[in-house]
């Protein structure tokens, strides 16, 4: 009986421990930024912490067709209390690069070490100069986030 209780207790601890590792997916709504100009971008960013990794999926529509974009997390800047207007430093190892389709839709998916983005306060999508992902503007769409 003691062995059974020990095994059940160990199983319960492992089960609960694995639940603590995975947080629910948080969804954030992207908002158009001044650099977006004539674009009518809208979309969502889903952020999921899984142990020591943060997985990100961004789905955006209303972008320029067949154009490269780069997205990444940013730290809070000092220019404004609003994260997307704060001018914070980009966290470059969180960069996701992709090309919109012929209708202006874009999906970006990737992961980064959780420790690298734990202090991020916003997620910004920029037009990219080319497939290398060098930003060409201050950002066309953005959302504040909480890690």
Language model region names:
Residues 9-18:
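Bacterial N-terminal signal peptides
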Residues 1-8:
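Bacterial N-terminal signal peptides that target proteins for export
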Residues 19-147:
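N-terminal leader/targeting pre-sequences
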